[in-house]
């Protein structure tokens, strides 16, 4: 996805951490492995995942509105158009995000006619407005959609209409628009009679030489829709939900600009143990930041939810973002975190809070305020709304306006603080280990053909109890055979041998598995996923059915669910009979039921029974289909919760905590104290260990642990092992000092651990742990942190002096504290003397 004030883990997204938000720096393996030059910034910071209510737009500046657009340019938000409930608007408002002030933007030239449900994008130093709905909504006259294109130049305030020759997109409103590769792209919308799903693009570099082009889309094109958002991330355009009549869904689609192909992204929330996608909705917003898409608001089945949903583009999972605790305290000011303050004892991070609805707590306040107000304002969650608009500046999202309860237009502005950390590479690292087949120590002999597939005992025994038993049986058989042959001393201590540079492969026979589906199963054990086959292709569906059979036999609930999701989503008229027959042959009852129910549907049955494949079905299956059609069985919805099994992270956590002790094959020495571990796991996660085990494997199977010249504490060493085995980044702040340089020294594949260590140090120094951190800073020569700890001790000495750990400090550290106290008292006396003079 937690420790005290910890940052985001690999599970649900949570708030309550103060951060500069983007601690990710370029990963440079040539960087010094010492923390002596570590520079820390002790605030004040904005809280990660904090909502803040900013000054609303006053009526004398601009009306409350909905169905408008907002764009971000430099340090300002620009609001154009919309409606105030009575009339359409075409004013342009500007909100300065630095001083939180509203004003009317300077404009010259002829602006677009008043409109709403238009689109606005930024390209270069201009804003482009396309289409929308115009006319007089009060008298219900002259209402029509537009397909005009206007440019607003921020530098001069000049409005200009682009006159385009040739074919034009049909006039529309409530469409999606974005900029990519110097072009404006528009998709779908409403033309006054029907919803659309066509796409058009136009170059924005030179209006004299450009024209509209219709895009030939392919793939799984979204249904015709309107009132939906689009966002670009990872060179792809994403579309989520929207109004599609009877076809409205909560599907997420992605569009590849290069080959102009759409793909519907499958959801696997049951399998991954993550929350489901947001409800289907319309009138919502979606913005992109880092590798995430953020969806807020909209109308979802007659409700106005105010949860913020986050989609991870890399891992294809949805999460509900938990707001920081200070988002929920009305009237609270943002606390300062200055290192010179005597309130340094308040440097604790807030506990992670569970999400609460705020619409019943916070009322709407549109009272008149000045156009410029202090930054430190009441922190509140925005209420649910639709037809609002959102934009991103730096590391924050700004949401303005919209329609709230009782059809009231809003003039509120809210700010949401993003988080940004390097992604977890755990699954990728183990995937590379599987693909590379280095350090394999087990060979599975499969089926009657005795095909061989190699793997790693540590990964396999961590993920599958069934395969673990087979491996243990093979080890016991081999040990007995060697003992009978006289190759093993009878009195040798039990347990795995360590230190062999190239131990022989352990052979494990599995007669019930064939090589190809078993390799897919192995890929899942290493990565928690399988590479998606071609959807609907009979060969691929049958392969996954074989994998499904193995998952049932090996009791891999997680893989079982994944296979079922893929197969059920892939069943269509072309392959249903083949899949049904295969399911009957493999005795896969649930899949067979799914196929039978698919066949006997009114819209499918006549087509299926006229196929040639139907004539070749076995007689019992034909009889079952006919009887199912004549007398469908009663539906019995199951209330049984779905068992999704354990994840890779959960299994590796249990493995480190003791479940894998009998399979250790390397010993790590910390100050002479042994810690058994697993070579394959260390090599997968660290290029340092990979190179050592490949070329410089110690003969005695023991590796001394240090980080450069420094030996970490036992506690910090265990924190590092937790990161290596299952990607855990939460740890006590003192551990972060030891491990700050670990990503460079041990060659981790990105600086995720370092980013969390840096934030942990900046955030979580308190009176309660300052002495432990002082000791760690002294040992690691982290001078910046040591000065900060001494500063806190001096200003909070009354509290620190009562801590029992003070009496356990070394003599030198006690002298450092006395020196700092003397200096502080001297400076204070000088200041008082100067004031008296």
Curated annotation (Swiss-Prot):
Disruption phenotype: Embryonic lethality between 17.5 dpc and birth. Impaired ubiquitination of Ras (K-Ras/Kras, N-Ras/Nras and H-Ras/Hras). Heterozygous mice display heart malformations, including decreased left ventricular systolic function, increased diastolic dimensions, eccentric hypertrophy, increased cardiomyocyte area and reduced longevity; phenotypes that are reminiscent of human Noonan Syndrome.
UniProt pathway annotation: Protein modification; protein ubiquitination
A Gene Ontology term for the protein's cellular component: Cul3-RING ubiquitin ligase complex
GO biological-process terms attached to the record: negative regulation of Ras protein signal transduction; protein ubiquitination
Sequence positions bearing N-acetylalanine: 2
Function: Substrate-specific adapter of a BCR (BTB-CUL3-RBX1) E3 ubiquitin-protein ligase complex that mediates ubiquitination of Ras (K-Ras/KRAS, N-Ras/NRAS and H-Ras/HRAS). Is a negative regulator of RAS-MAPK signaling that acts by controlling Ras levels and decreasing Ras association with membranes.
Similarity section: Belongs to the LZTR1 family.
PANTHER family noted in UniProt: LEUCINE-ZIPPER-LIKE TRANSCRIPTIONAL REGULATOR 1
Protein name in the entry: Leucine-zipper-like transcriptional regulator 1
Organism: Mus musculus
Lineage of the organism: Eukaryota, Metazoa, Chordata, Craniata, Vertebrata
Gene this chain is encoded by: Lztr1
């Amino acid at each position: 996805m937690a420790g005290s004030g910890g940052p985001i883990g690999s599970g649900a997204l949570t708030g309550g951490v103060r951060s500069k938000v983007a601690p990710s720096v370029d990963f440079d393996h040539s960087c010094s492995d010492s923390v002596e030059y570590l520079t820390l910034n002790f605030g004040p910071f904005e809280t990660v995942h904090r909502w803040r209510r900013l000054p609303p737009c006053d009526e004398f500046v601009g009306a409350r509105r909905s169905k408008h657009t907002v764009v971000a340019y430099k340090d300002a938000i620009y609001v154009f158009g919309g409606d105030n409930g009575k009339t359409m608007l075409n004013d342009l408002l500007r909100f300065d995000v630095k001083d939180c002030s509203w004003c009317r933007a300077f404009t010259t030239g002829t602006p677009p006619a008043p409109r709403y449900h238009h689109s606005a994008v930024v390209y270069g130093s201009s804003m482009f407005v396309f289409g929308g709905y115009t006319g007089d909504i009060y008298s219900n006259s002259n209402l029509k959609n537009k397909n005009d294109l206007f440019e607003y130049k921020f530098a001069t305030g000049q409005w200009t209409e682009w006159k385009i020759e040739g074919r034009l997109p049909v006039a529309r409103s409530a469409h999606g628009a974005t900029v990519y590769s110097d072009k404006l792209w528009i998709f779908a919308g409403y033309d006054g009679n029907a919803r659309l799903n066509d796409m058009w693009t136009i170059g924005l570099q030179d209006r004299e030489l450009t024209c509209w082009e219709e895009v030939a889309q392919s793939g799984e094109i979204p249904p015709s829709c309107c009132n939906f958002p689009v966002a670009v991330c990872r060179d792809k355009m994403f579309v989520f939900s929207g109004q599609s009549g009877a076809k409205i869904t909560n599907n997420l689609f992605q569009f590849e600009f290069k080959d102009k192909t759409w793909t519907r992204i499958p959801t696997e929330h049951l399998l991954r143990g993550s929350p489901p996608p947001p409800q289907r909705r319309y009138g919502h917003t979606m913005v992109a930041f880092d590798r995430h898409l953020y969806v807020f608001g909209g109308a979802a089945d007659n409700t106005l939810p105010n949860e913020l949903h986050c989609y991870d583009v890399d891992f294809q999972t949805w999460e509900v973002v938990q707001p920081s605790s200070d988002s929920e305290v009305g009237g609270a000011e943002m606390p300062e975190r200055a290192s010179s303050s005597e309130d340094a004892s308040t440097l604790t991070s807030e506990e992670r809070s569970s999400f609460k609805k705020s619409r019943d707590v916070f009322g709407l306040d549109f009272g008149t305020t000045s156009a410029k107000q202090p930054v430190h304002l009441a922190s509140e969650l925005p209420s649910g709304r639709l037809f609002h608009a959102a934009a991103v500046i730096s590391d924050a999202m700004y949401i303005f306006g919209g329609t709230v309860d009782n059809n009231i237009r809003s003039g509120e502005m809210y700010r949401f603080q993003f988080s940004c950390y390097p992604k977890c590479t755990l699954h990728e690292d183990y995937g590379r280990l599987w693909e590379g087949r280095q350090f394999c120590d087990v060979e599975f002999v499969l089926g009657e053909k005795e095909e061989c597939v190699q793997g790693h005992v540590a990964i396999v025994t961590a993920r599958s109890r069934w395969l673990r038993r087979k491996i243990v049986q093979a080890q016991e058989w081999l040990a007995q055979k060697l003992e009978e042959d006289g190759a093993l001393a009878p009195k040798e201590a039990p347990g795995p041998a360590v230190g062999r540079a190239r131990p022989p492969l352990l052979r494990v026979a599995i007669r019930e598995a064939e090589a190809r589906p078993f390799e897919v199963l192995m890929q899942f054990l290493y990565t928690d996923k399988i590479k998606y086959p071609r959807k609907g292709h009979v060969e691929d569906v049958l392969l996954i059915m074989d994998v499904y059979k193995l998952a049932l036999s090996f009791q891999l609930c997680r893989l079982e669910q994944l296979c079922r999701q893929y197969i059920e989503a892939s069943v269509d008229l072309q392959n249903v009979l083949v899949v049904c027959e295969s399911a009957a042959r493999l005795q896969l009852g649930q899949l067979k039921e799914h196929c039978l129910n698919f066949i006997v549907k009114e819209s499918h049955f006549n087509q299926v029974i006229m196929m040639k494949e139907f004539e070749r079905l076995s007689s019992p299956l034909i009889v079952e289909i006919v009887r199912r059609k004549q007398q469908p069985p009663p539906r019995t919805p199951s209330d049984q919760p779905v068992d999704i099994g354990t994840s890779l992270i959960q299994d590796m956590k249990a493995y480190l905590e003791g479940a894998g002790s009998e399979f250790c094959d390397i010993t790590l020495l910390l100050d002479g104290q042994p810690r058994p571990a697993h070579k394959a796991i260390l090599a997968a996660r660290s290029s340092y260990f990979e190179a050592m085990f490949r070329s410089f494997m110690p003969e005695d199977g023991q590796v001394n642990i240090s980080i450069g010249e420094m030996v970490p504490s036992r506690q910090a060493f265990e924190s590092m092992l937790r990161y290596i085995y299952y990607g855990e980044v939460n740890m006590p702040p003192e551990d972060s000092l030891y491990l700050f340089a670990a990503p460079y020294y041990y060659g981790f594949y990105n600086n995720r651990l370092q980013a969390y260590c840096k934030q942990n140090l900046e955030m979580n120094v308190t009176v309660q742990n300052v002495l432990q951190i002082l000791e760690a800073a002294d040992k690691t020569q982290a001078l910046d942190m040591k000065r900060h700890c001494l500063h806190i001790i001096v200003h909070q000495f009354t509290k620190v002096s009562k801590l029992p750990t003070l009496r356990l400090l070394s003599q030198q550290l006690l002298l450092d504290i006395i020196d700092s106290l003397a200096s502080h008292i001297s400076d204070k006396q000088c200041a008082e003397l100067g004031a008296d003079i």
